[in-house]
Design a protein with these regions (language model features):
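Patatin-like phospholipase
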Residues: 1-69, 77-263
């Protein structure tokens, strides 16, 4: 085929949002049956991970276990729903959304990143980044989304069994990604949650994969190997903002190991 033919073919198969007639999940051609796929968080560094997710989907790869924390949970749900369009737009498109945050949002106590808008009001049909819930819910994979429970100091993981509809998924993704100070605490079933990277693994759901019996893991990182987050320099900020949860949060901030370890 000529270059023009190839360009026409690319245009005709370009990913489109869920809800349009042309939308289709990326097909599965290869199953990696004994490997868990783990996505590290890292805020907008997840944009680079999203490019890898696109490559995995375009290659037709399927993993029986997919899990992530913080921005990693966004890549997790897009991988499981096999949505090439949303994989990119959930990060790149977000930068053009005027309601996504800023200092005005922070002053109004919605957070510097307006997590309520980002996670609860952009994913329904007809909204900015419609999510393919039917494909996600029907996926033959184990899914794990991790968040830090502030009142107990434990990392909590949710799976497909905990979510019956889209409205169950969205607050869990919000909780997993809510950075202290920059975003409000999220309450689920009456319990307070923040960014899952506050947990003991520092943002890697490798403990959840191991608990589910996986020994081999493909861990997609957003920091260099060996990176360690320094101890929190201003614990007083957290003391003022989270007095009832101080010990759990400060202990986590000062001891989290942000490396998945040898795998």
């Amino acid at each position: 085929p000529t270059p023009a033919d190839r360009l026409a073919a690319m245009s005709s198969t370009r990913p489109v949002p869920y809800g349009l007639p042309e939308h289709a999940p990326a097909p599965i051609t290869t199953r990696v049956d004994d490997v868990a796929l783990v996505f590290e968080g890292g805020g907008m560094r997840g944009t680079y991970t999203a490019a890898l997710v696109q490559v995995l989907l375009e290659a037709g790869l399927f993993f029986p276990w997919v899990g992530g924390i913080s921005a990693g949970c966004t890549n997790t749900v897009n991988m499981v729903s096999r949505d090439l369009w949303r994989t990119r737009e959930a990060f790149v498109g977000l930068t053009t959304d005027p309601q996504a945050g800023g200092w005005g949002s922070f002053i109004r106590r919605r957070g510097y990143f307006n997590s309520d808008h980002i996670y609860r009001h952009t994913s329904a049909p007809g909204e900015l980044f419609p999510f393919d819930w039917p494909t996600f819910k029907a996926a033959p994979a184990t899914v794990r989304i991790g968040s830090f429970r502030c009142d107990t100091g434990e990392e909590v993981y949710w799976g497909l069994e905990d979510m019956d509809e889209l409205e169950d998924l969205l607050p869990r993704c919000q909780a997993s990604s809510s950075m202290p100070v920059l975003m409000p605490v999220v309450h689920i079933d009456g319990a307070p949650y923040l960014d899952g990277a506050l947990g003991s693994t520092g943002g890697f759901a490798t403990d959840a994969a191991a608990a589910d019996g996986y020994e081999k893991m493909l861990v997609v990182m957003t920091r260099p190997v060996g990176y360690r987050k320094p101890a929190e320099k201003r614990p007083g900020v957290y003391r003022r903002l989270f007095p009832s949860n101080l010990l759990n949060i400060l202990s986590s901030l000062n001891t989290s190991d942000t490396s998945p370890g040898p795998r």
